[in-house]
Amino acid sequence: MARAFLLVLDSFGVGGAPDAERYGDLGANTLGHIAEFCAAGAADRAGLRAGPLKLPNMCSLGLLEIARQASGDIPAGMEPPERIFGLHGSASEISKGKDTPSGHWEIAGTPVTFDWGYFPTEGDAFSPELVEAICRQADIPGILGNCHASGTEIIAALGEEHIRSGKPICYTSSDSVFQIAAHETHFGLDRLIALCETVRKLLDPLNIGRVIARPFIGETVATFERTGNRRDFSVPPPEPTLLDRLVEAGRKVHAIGKIGDIYAHQGVTRVIKANGNAALMDATLHAIDEAENGDLVFTNFVDFDMLYGHRRDVAGYAAALEAFDARIPEIHRKMAPGDIALLTADHGCDPTWRGTDHTRERVPIMAFGPGIRSRDVGIRSSYADIGESIAHHLGIEAGSHGRSFI
């Protein structure tokens, strides 16, 4: 039996990107800075966590050596393992963006070598012509926001006005994205999804990567809270990905969390929705039980990025990493001979960095399973090597990008 389990710790970068300066991210290091804050006691939070960052299972998969290779530094305060199991290394990104689709598509063997469209103006981000077209086609009275913003902050600032006026909150960031926040009951979840579908069509000519529905509940600024009904409306990848090649070869792709949305549901045979890292891990373990020979189980663990990276919450990010690490043995116990599990990330989002955006970083590669020997695979020149390694392991034809390290 040969199966593959690909787990993306969304935004868990390890620093060291050779082109970080071009993105204003020279020195950004998600793992390194979290560990530094933890070692200094700056990520202690009563009832949540305290002390140095404790990731014993990932360290046994080579995380400290990965960090040393990628950025030149061993994370502060972390305990080295007695020995390293499995394949370990890191990868640089060749895609031009530092966003979720770019990272995931490159992981699956399709780097984004073209330029995304963006909304670079921080105020009045969307043109009057675009706003007018959205309002007319979606039959809405107008929009709120129209700026670069943090999602939680703009909901706090405009949520009550949104409820009163019926106008959705529209905003963007340095990524190629158009985000729409609306109340699940006052505006309606189905109406929000329909609005996003309308906006998606209008933005296709502008080459905007994603339209994201951001539903929330609550009646006042003190009670507003995002729900788990987020939806991403992505443009499809520009060429077949690992997922497409697997499906064409008669294999199944179990897409957990937002994986289906990221690939515009291309190359996906089964979509499994779950909300929160714990539920995503539960869903992953259940999918492993059901996966057949040749299948791929593919999960995005979004909380690292959405709840802690963008919100610059170091303690929250550290606690989430420790909780994830504690469950890695559950994956080990589910694995059969011939299986491989691979942990990686799609970009960085250093919670100690300025602003609220992603950071350009290398990502870790930690691969393990029965029969997988410990080996340093070095610094890979593209995330695409990850997808090609899975393709090789599952015995399908190689793609056009990347090189297997298996």
Curated annotation (Swiss-Prot):
Keyword Transit peptide on entry: no
UniProt signal peptide: none
Binding site for Mn(2+) 1: 10, 346-347
EC number: 5.4.2.7
Cell membrane is among the record's keywords: no
GO cellular component: cytosol
SUPFAM superfamilies for this protein: Alkaline phosphatase-like (SSF53649), DeoB insert domain-like (SSF143856)
Residues noted as binding Mn(2+) 2 in the record, renumbered to the chain: 305, 310, 358
Cofactor(s) this protein cannot do without: Mn(2+)
GO MF, one example: manganese ion binding
Organism from which the protein derives: Agrobacterium fabrum (strain C58 / ATCC 33970)
InterPro entries in the cross-refs: Alkaline_phosphatase_core_sf, DeoB, Metalloenzyme, Phosphopentomutase_DeoB_cap_sf
Gene3D superfamilies, alphabetized: Alkaline Phosphatase, subunit A, Phosphopentomutase
Compartment list: Cytoplasm
GO biological process: 2-deoxyribose 1-phosphate catabolic process; 5-phosphoribose 1-diphosphate biosynthetic process; metabolic compound salvage; nucleotide metabolic process
Protein's job: Isomerase that catalyzes the conversion of deoxy-ribose 1-phosphate (dRib-1-P) and ribose 1-phosphate (Rib-1-P) to deoxy-ribose 5-phosphate (dRib-5-P) and ribose 5-phosphate (Rib-5-P), respectively.
Underlying gene: deoB
Domain of life: Bacteria
Primary localization: cytoplasm
UniProt KW keywords: Cytoplasm, Isomerase, Manganese, Metal-binding
Pathway: Carbohydrate degradation; 2-deoxy-D-ribose 1-phosphate degradation; D-glyceraldehyde 3-phosphate and acetaldehyde from 2-deoxy-alpha-D-ribose 1-phosphate: step 1/2
Protein known as: Phosphopentomutase
Family indicated by similarity: Belongs to the phosphopentomutase family.
Cofactor note: Binds 2 manganese ions.
